[in-house]
């Protein structure tokens, strides 16, 4: 089959890789939630060969991911998992979770579900990295983000750029502590949380 292509993956993969190198250096098993085309997975798995990179997606997107994984044939990219966040989740636990450009596509109920289920798939000291655009103090960080949010809502009113404070509140309830909020190109962010770390320790 013709492999799906997301040009944004080529634009953002190097900056994201920098964050992953910093925070996933001592990690071993990554669950990527919403792997999309699979292009991020093969790039990060090739660059970070110490990681076992587990992709996941809704059923209709799995063939495209398999096509990329089959072509690259990396030893650290197992068969993608079917994951609808409102349905059944994996039974395995991971010491790292990664998700890019998903929270603004999901409905808010789905975002809540993700954070509610994260403790079930995370080890005691697991880390979560979420990449994408976020609002702060209820405000867009750029005119381009405001335009992007309007475009998202034309596609579906359940979509939209999320408020950082609301997402972080879900993370806190799930037992996660924000340890970095890194600015990324094109008005995006990488939010990094760790489980089992107090906010005081994270800011020390």
Model-derived segments and their meaning:
Residues 1-26:
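Class I SAM-dependent methyltransferase Rossmann-like catalytic core
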Residues 26-36:
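Conserved class I S-adenosyl-L-methionine
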Residues 31, 39-87:
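Class I SAM-dependent methyltransferase SAM/SAH-binding core
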Residues 89-97:
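A short acidic, Gly/Pro-enriched loop at the edge of an enzyme's catalytic core
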Residues 106-118:
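A short, conserved alpha-helix within the catalytic core of class I
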Residues 125-137:
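Conserved beta-strand signature within the Rossmann-like core of class I S-adenosyl-L-methionine
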Residues 141-165:
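Conserved Class I S-adenosyl-L-methionine
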Residues 176-204:
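Core SAM-dependent methyltransferase catalytic element
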């Amino acid at each position: 089959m013709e492999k799906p292509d997301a040009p944004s993956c080529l634009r953002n993969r190097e900056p994201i890789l920098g964050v992953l190198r910093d925070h996933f250096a001592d990690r071993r098993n990554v669950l990527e939630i919403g792997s999309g085309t699979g292009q991020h997975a093969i790039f990060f798995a090739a660059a970070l060969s110490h990681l076992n990179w587990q992709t996941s997606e809704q059923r209709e997107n799995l063939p495209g991911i398999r096509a990329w994984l089959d072509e690259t044939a990396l030893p650290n990219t197992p068969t993608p998992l079917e994951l609808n966040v409102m349905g059944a989740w994996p039974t395995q636990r991971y010491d790292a979770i990664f998700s890019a450009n998903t929270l603004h596509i999901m409905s808010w109920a789905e975002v809540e579900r993700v954070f509610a289920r994260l403790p079930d798939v995370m080890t005691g000291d697991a880390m979560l990295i979420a990449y994408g655009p976020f609002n702060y103090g209820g405000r867009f960080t750029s005119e381009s983000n405001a335009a992007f949010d309007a475009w998202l809502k034309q596609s579906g009113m359940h979509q939209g750029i999320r408020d950082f404070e609301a997402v972080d509140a879900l993370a806190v309830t799930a037992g996660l502590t924000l340890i970095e909020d890194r600015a990324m190109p094109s008005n995006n962010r990488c939010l990094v949380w760790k489980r089992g770390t107090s906010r005081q320790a994270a800011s020390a």
